A protein has these predicted regions:
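Bacterial N-terminal signal peptides that target proteins for export
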Residues: 3-22
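C-terminal motif of bacterial Sec signal peptides marking the signal peptidase cleavage site
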Residues: 29-32
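Small-residue-enriched, tightly packed secondary-structure blocks
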Residues: 34-196
Length: 196
């Protein structure tokens, strides 16, 4: 006669869910986390940042005046976001002051909730005041706050602002979205300094 452990049967769906979540997390980090090697060297980040910046200027010429009037700009050429219930995003970029590269930063975020899929996008953050720039540089794990305006640029549409109409000290543009994942957001994203 076969003895059946009812506790094991009862916990089977929970264990299956935990296993799927665990595998999703591991898969996400294996696919999206970038290792510190030649492909992520400072020179490669700088090159990619310049290409992304020129792309933004082409699709929205109003951003040229914003760039020229900003004391500093953080350019993250590619952010990869993926999720299956648990999700996360990661990207690396360069901080430019007076158009010269001075530091490298990562963006990382985690999320939980209904989500499935993957997406890549670019992000440029314009620091419009010296005070906003200093707050960013002194805090490791900096997050966008109430002093920031975030614009998600859809294909074919201008972001609708110029350096004369910006009212916040931090201005972020998310653009060039590729892939399918609802809810692209910078909420909860942490920016940390990298050594490159």
């Amino acid at each position: 006669m076969k003895i059946v452990n009812h506790k094991m049967i009862k916990n089977l769906p929970v264990n299956k869910i935990r296993t799927n979540i665990f595998l999703s997390i591991i898969t996400f980090f294996l696919l999206s986390c970038q290792t510190i090697d030649q492909k992520n060297s400072g020179s490669v980040i700088n090159r990619d940042a310049e290409l992304v910046l020129q792309n933004l200027f082409e699709i929205d010429p109003d951003t040229i005046s914003i760039y020229k009037n900003a004391p500093a700009t953080l350019i993250i050429p590619k952010i990869t976001k993926a999720g299956l219930v648990l999700g996360g995003a990661y990207g690396e970029g360069v901080l430019r002051i007076n158009e010269a590269p001075v530091d490298y930063y990562s963006l990382a975020s985690a999320s939980y909730g209904p989500q499935i899929g993957a997406q890549q996008y670019s992000n440029i953050i314009f620091f419009m005041t010296e005070e906003a720039l200093q707050k960013f540089r002194v805090k490791d794990g900096w997050e966008l706050g109430a002093d920031a305006e975030v614009v998600f640029r859809d294909k074919g549409y201008s972001i609708g602002v110029s350096s004369k109409t910006i009212s916040k000290p931090v201005y972020a543009v998310v653009f060039d979205q590729k892939g399918l994942l609802a809810g692209t957001s910078l909420v909860g994203a942490k920016f940390s300094r990298l050594i490159r």
